[in-house]
A protein has these predicted regions:
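Flexible loop residues that form catalytic
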Residues: 15, 75, 125-126, 224
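Active-site gating loops and adjacent loop-to-helix segments of metal-dependent hydrolytic enzymes
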Residues: 30-33, 141-145, 185, 191-205
Length: 233
């Protein structure tokens, strides 16, 4: 599928972690960039920040030099100071792992002052964060980058939103595309997101085509390549 769609690589995490490496064995090391997830199963998404057993789990599965970042991890406002969260943030810093938080603008505003020396890739551009909120954090935190999966509001109905377009132009080196093919139970019990993957990619390319060529190339792949290249090994 990646070959057919021209997708070169992606950040991948699994619950449990072994799924990432099964996929990597099939697609190759260059295609699958492993992320260190704090989740053993779907329920950990909601409880990990207060579950002390997550710390030894993360430490036990960590593959030094192979996992490139810590995340995606869900973080609510008021949770950045919790002991489990602080312990794993410190672990990520010691191991030179970038952070990939799934957090709204308020939670990010609490997190970023605690991790000023760490590179942060903001998952889903804050999920519900407005362009103004994203801009405010980018202006303040130079080590913050932004990933755009699940943000249908970037191009409602396929037409690029003017506010997002202006923000991309102001920060041409900070944004990158994403798709997010999660499976969480309930409605999503199988391969629904993977089945929709070609449509997701085509939708992204539709709004990228509405940007200037160089800016579109940055968001499509160049920024992600630069992001990975500047990470410590």
């Amino acid at each position: 599928m990646f070959d057919q769609l021209g997708v070169e690589s992606g950040l991948v995490s699994s619950a449990p972690d072994e799924g990432t490496f099964r996929l990597r064995a099939v697609l190759g090391e260059a295609r699958v960039i492993p992320m260190l997830s704090p989740y053993r199963n779907g329920t950990d998404v909601f409880s990990w920040a207060r579950d002390g057993s997550i710390v030894p789990y993360v430490e036990s599965i960590y593959r030094q030099g192979t996992h490139r970042g810590f995340g995606e991890f869900h973080l609510n406002a008021g949770q950045s100071g919790l002991p489990v969260v602080r312990t794993l943030l410190a672990f990520a810093q010691r191991e030179n792992l970038f952070l990939q938080p799934h957090a709204d603008a308020r939670a990010m505003a609490e997190l970023l002052p605690l991790v000023t020396d760490q590179t942060v890739l903001w998952a889903h551009a804050g999920v519900t964060a407005t362009p103004d909120q994203v801009e405010a954090l980018l202006a303040k935190w130079p080590k913050l980058w932004v990933e755009l999966s699940l943000r249908d509001d970037v191009a409602p109905g396929g037409k690029l939103d003017a506010r997002w377009g202006a923000l991309f132009a102001k920060y041409p080196d900070k944004f990158m595309v994403g798709t997010d093919t999660w499976t969480v139970g309930g409605t999503y019990t199988g391969n629904e997101r993977w089945d929709a993957y070609p449509d997701l990619v085509r939708g992204i390319r539709t709004w990228l085509a509405q940007l200037p060529t160089e800016l579109a190339a940055n968001i499509a792949h160049r920024n992600a390549e630069r992001f990975l290249a500047q990470l410590p090994r």
